[in-house]
Amino acid sequence: MTDAFLSDAPRPEGGAPDAPASSTALPELHRLLPPWPGDQLPVSGGEVFVRRTPWTGPVDGDVDGAPRERALYVHGLGGASTNWTDLAGLLAVRLEGWAVDLPGFGRSQPPPRGRYSIRGHVRAVVDVLEHVRAQPGEGLGRPVHLLGNSLGGLVSLLVAAHRPDLVATLTLVSPAMPVYRVPPSFSRALLLLLLPGIPSLAEKRMAGITPEESVRAMVRMCFGDPARVPRERIDQAVAEMRERSEQPWADRALTRSMRGLITSYLRVGRANAWRMAASLSQPTLVIWGDRDKLVDPALAPRLAAVVPDSRLRLLEGIGHVAMLEAPEPTARAVLGMLEQLPGR
């Protein structure tokens, strides 16, 4: 994408500091982790599926006095809670984790009357955060570390701005921030989704795509180096896509959430996401792959410069889903931020 794509996004006046990388010992991912178990959770107007990753404590087993905090992971457009499997497993040395399937995605039911919107996703995440914070044990009643990717990054940013009492820190992995002056070819394809009837046509076209084709396209678009993706992860993704294809609302969830995302870009004034970013009070980590094909990496320093208490980590050779493609560097950046917080 050209710089014209970004010309109306805020320009940094000063660079954000580089995110430190933690030297904490992490479990070795000798094998691919299976998806963490989960359950349906009631939220406003329905239910969402939430997976839970138990806290493991330090690798050396010395749990006396070891920090034990809580985290919520929010996936991106077309993703699911399983996108966070490996990262949640690594961060379990410090964080007990919950990962949500946004309404209509993964194993979650669609929202009431099929009304997908950014605000609806924000409400669902707030409800899950309230649930996580209310769970008994260490961390009861405390703010939760919130991590989001792409659409989930934008949703997480808005949650942190609206409900700072719920969010301890914010980690944004290639968040889908508003961009303007889009190149004409890109603009026409997306803006058509705003027209009545077009999302339904897109849904019909998507219904003819096989799970294997969908996964191959996703890997090409989302990963900096598709060859890095283990065959087992491809097979797992295809199985998930087959499961999704049996849900009558699956294609609608994707197209209508994309429409809601584009609509949210049109908000001005205090409701604009860039204004919200400037109002954040939480320590914030911005992570971006320099081969991101979906959200231009040039946005990374701009976002980090706008957020008051931010740090930035750019990952060389990585695409749009750093938590999937580079879980260990991502985990070390998250832990590096947490270890720098006062009293940690």
Annotate the PLM regions.
Residues 153-164, 170:
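Short glycine-enriched nucleophile-adjacent loop
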Residues 308-344:
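Catalytic active-site module of serine/aspartate enzymes centered on a nucleophile-bearing elbow/loop
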Residues 206-276:
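Conserved alpha/beta-hydrolase catalytic His-Asp/Glu region
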Residues 280, 286-288:
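Short beta-strand/loop motif that positions the catalytic acidic residue
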Residues 120-142:
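Conserved acidic catalytic loop of the alpha/beta-hydrolase fold
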Residues 267, 291-295:
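Acidic catalytic loop of the alpha/beta-hydrolase fold
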Residues 169-204:
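Flexible "cap/lid" loop of the alpha/beta hydrolase fold
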